[in-house]
Amino acid sequence: MFGAIAGGIASALAGGVMSKLFGGGQKAASGGIQGDVLATDNNTVGMGDAGIKSAIQGSNVPNSDEAAPSFLSGAMAKAGKGLLEGTLQAGTSAVSDKLLDLVGLGGKSAADKGKDTRDYLAAAFPELNAWERAGAGASSSAIVDAGFENQKELTKMQLDNQKEIAEMQNETQKEIAGIQSATSRQNTKDQVYAQNEMLAYQQKESTARVASIMENTNLSKQQQVSEIMRQMLTQAQTAGQYFTNDQIKEMTRKVSAEVDLVHQQTQNQRYGSSHIGATAKDISNVVTDAASGVVDIFHGIDKAVADTWNNFWKDGKADGIGSNLSRK
């Protein structure tokens, strides 16, 4: 109803404007054919104005008080009328919408209607709103939080992997160290065993040589002492042991005294013969006693020297090198 009222008001206003703009109120100048004259001296035809005009122009008889419009004025009038009518129509629509909005009956825009429809569907059918459930309507902060959580999980996985790798490497290093330690112990044991075997062999060989020297009656006492000392010093140098000149002189003196003692022992009742090499048994006993005799020369000298030579001369039968001044 209010729309019709507003439209009527706008139409009335438009009509008034049109009548003011295009012609109303002008009268045509009198002149030309007047009265009922059909022919005059000026060749004008006169008859009833209404009849002639009706015959020529048909039933649409123009007003005799109005001037006939020209072509230009008619075209301008039509164009202006169309423009004005369009403008007035738009203005009328705007005024109508405004009046309807004021009384609460105005229409809504397409965007507002779409929003209303969306809100209605979301409230009425929440299970159909898959787009919202998928998180499409979430804010960018939620997306950032999700990315941060993913990064945390990835970092945790990387740290866990590095920890596992480090533990595996540590276990591997332990196993390698254990294998190397066991191998080293075995090698050390084998080396010690080999060294002991070599030492025992060298000890027996030295003892045999000393016995051989002592059995050689063709050698004088001084020669026997010199040979024994040479054998002992060679044995020491092979083991990396060296003596000073004073130590060598002291050992030479001891060896000389021990050689005299060995000769005296070979003539006692134990062997029953003055000849050292008379029998194999006698020779074996002489070897043992000779070795013991040679070892005993270290009594009374420095303990470090005695300990060193003890490693070379003690074979289980002999007593080895004793320390200071103790003697059997």
Swiss-Prot record:
Q: Which UniProt keywords apply?
A: Capsid protein, Viral genome ejection through host cell envelope, Viral penetration into host cytoplasm, Virion, Virus entry into host cell
S-S bridge residues: none
GO biological process per UniProt: symbiont entry into host cell
What is the name of the protein in this document? Minor spike protein
| GO cellular component: a single term | viral capsid
Task: Describe the function of this protein.
Answer: Minor spike component of the viral shell. Involved in the ejection of the phage DNA in the host and is injected with the DNA in the periplasmic space of the host. Involved in the determination of the phage host-range.
Q: Which organism is it from?
A: Enterobacteria phage S13
Say which domain of life the source belongs to.
Answer: Viruses
Q: Where in the cell is it found?
A: Virion
InterPro entries in alphabetical order: Microvir_H (IPR006777)
Q: How does the record describe its quaternary structure?
A: The virion is composed of 60 copies each of the F, G, and J proteins, and 12 copies of the H protein. There are 12 spikes which are each composed of 5 G and one H proteins.
**Keyword match Endoplasmic reticulum:** no
